[in-house]
């Protein structure tokens, strides 16, 4: 009887030494990264001239990047470029036409290292104080526009609503 009492006392004491901490293996869900900025686009034209216009850039990390090019003075959208990991959509608002190309269709045109993740890294890097905020066409993976420049400024990382661009029936698809 005395041995049973000591055994019971030992079990109670060992149970009291149990740790109250629980190990959880849940991985926190990463929130999407939001980034927006104003932009200035300079495209060479003719022998010595160039065209400069403004616009906006919006990025929702891992999902899409939208560039809206605005007409000087009137500030209406004249073109939109929407890039996702799977496709690129370019809309010419002035001439009411658009081009939609899948990643597979662009593999022959773009350099091999042109990836959506690389574009995201460039844009995030440009938003940092020590980052390079002026990018050339070559750095953006568009060798045919290597002399073109995009300057990004007035960055914000506040969350915003961004929906995929819808194209109305008034627009003609360019093959």
Locations of the language-model features?
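Post-signal-peptide N-terminal segment of Sec-exported extracytoplasmic proteins
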Residues: 34-76
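An acidic-aromatic
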Residues: 64-117
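Generic beta-strand structural signal
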Residues: 59-61, 83, 134-135
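Sec-dependent signal peptide recognition
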Residues: 2-8
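Non-transmembrane domains of secretory- and envelope-associated proteins
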Residues: 135-175
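Bacterial signal peptide processing site
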Residues: 18-21
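N-terminal helix-cap/turn-to-beta initiation motif at the start of protein domains
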Residues: 23-36
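C-terminal motif of bacterial Sec signal peptides marking the signal peptidase cleavage site
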Residues: 13-16
């Amino acid at each position: 009887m005395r041995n049973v009492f000591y055994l019971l006392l030992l079990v109670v004491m060992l149970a009291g030494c149990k740790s109250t901490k629980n190990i959880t293996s849940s991985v926190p869900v990463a929130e999407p990264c939001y980034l927006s900025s104003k932009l200035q686009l300079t495209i060479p034209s003719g022998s010595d001239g160039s065209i400069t216009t403004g616009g906006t850039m919006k990025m929702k990390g891992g999902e899409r990047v939208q560039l809206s090019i605005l007409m000087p003075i009137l500030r209406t959208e004249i073109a939109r470029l929407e890039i996702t990991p799977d496709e690129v959509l370019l809309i010419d608002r002035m001439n009411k036409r658009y081009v939609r190309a899948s990643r597979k269709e662009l593999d022959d045109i773009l350099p091999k290292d042109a990836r959506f993740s690389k574009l995201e890294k460039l844009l995030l890097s440009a938003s940092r104080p020590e980052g390079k905020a002026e990018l050339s066409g070559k750095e953006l993976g568009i060798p045919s526009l290597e002399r073109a420049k995009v300057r990004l400024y007035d960055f914000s990382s506040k969350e915003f609503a961004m929906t995929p661009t819808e194209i109305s029936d008034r627009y003609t698809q360019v093959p």
